[in-house]
Structures are given as structure tokens and as C-alpha cells.
Amino acid sequence: METKPARVRILDAAHELMLTVGLARATTKEIARAAGCSEAALYKYFDSKEELFVRVLTERLPRLTPLLDSLAAAPGRGTLEENLTEIARQAALFYEQSFPIAASLYAETQLKRRHDDTLRTMGSGPHLPLQGLDAYLRAEQAAGRVHPDADTYAAASLLMGACAQRAFAYDTTESGERPPVDAFATRLARTLLGGIAVADRP
């Protein structure tokens, strides 16, 4: 059987360890061991654990940012409801998979501060999807499909916030199950549209 390239093995191992033990406890040494390579080899491909974390988010999780970028670059394509439904679906899946990875950071204050500083230096962070959705809604506003008085940043915050909350808000319900992602995304998009869409427009 063909062996995967080292970079792929490292990303796979990092993804698995970050999901199972959390970002705070997934050391580069453990990741390298799980990938079957040395820690020095890991640093040939990734400058830091923070960079590895960002690459896991962008290459192993639902591709939320590319979706937002492509929609913002071509406003007027598809219907608003279709586009917002797909954004909500991808965002819900992204947060569902990323929340268990990042949650452990909040128990380690110094590690969290260092992590935030590194992401800031890299120009990355959890604010990017929010900014990306705001940019898309502003593009649609300029195209005449979002009401001119709509607060696009608030609308983006409502959608992304609901998608993020879905990752953990249902753990203590009787069933412990999240709402099915497709139905959740459809309802969320339709409700948001009721507040921002131009009347009688798609």
C-alpha cells in the first residue's frame, strides 16, 4: 500500500489528536509520533503548532472561508436563500468539528494568549468567517438584493453565532442530539432573510 506523504500524515495525525485530546494537550511531539516521523520533520512543514492548527481547520474541516470568498466575489449568483442555507450548513459543520479541538484552550490562559498572538501574527482567527459573511452580505446589498438599511454585520453575527452555538448547546437536552444540519440551516437562512431581504426579490 502506498505511503502517504509526510505532510498529509502529519495533518491527519494532528486532526485526530486535536479531536481526541484537544488542542492544548496535542503536543507536536505526540503529533509527530502518531504521524510516524520525527518532531524535526514536522517543523520542516509547519512553523508552529498554531500553524498546524490553522492548516487542520482549512484542509481537514468543511471549507467555510473559500465558500464565503467565492460568494462575495460574485454577488447575484444563485438565490439569497440558497446561498445563506449553504453558508449556514457549512458553518454549522465547521463549528461542530472545530469546537472540540479548540475548547481546551480556554482552560489554559497563558496558552490561549500565546495561541491568539500567533494567529493574530498569521492574519488568522475565528473572526474571519464573520467578516467573510459580512463582506458577502454587503456585496449583495450593493447588488440590491439585501435591504439598504440592513445591518449586515449584525446579520452575519446572528447566523454565525447560531451555527457556533449548535456545536454545544444541545449536549444536555434529553436526547443530547443536535438539530439535523440541513433542516437547521434552512430554517436559519429563511429567518435571517425575513429581516434583511428586499421584498419580492430572490
List each language-model region with its residue ranges:
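Conserved hydrophobic residue
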Residues: 24, 146-147
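Hydrophobic alpha-helical connector segments
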Residues: 55, 68-97, 152-156
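Amphipathic alpha-helical packing segments from all-alpha helical-bundle domains
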Residues: 96-97, 101-104, 113-143, 152-157
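N-terminal intrinsically disordered/low-complexity leader segments
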Residues: 1-5, 200-202
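Generic hydrophobic, amphipathic alpha-helix propensity
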Residues: 6-14, 31, 56-60, 64, ...
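Helix-turn-helix
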Residues: 9, 17-51, 55
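C-terminal peripheral helix-coil segments that are non-catalytic and often amphipathic
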Residues: 82, 86, 93, 127-143, ...
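Helix-loop "lid/cap" segments that line or gate small-molecule binding pockets
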Residues: 73, 88-96, 103-111, 191-195
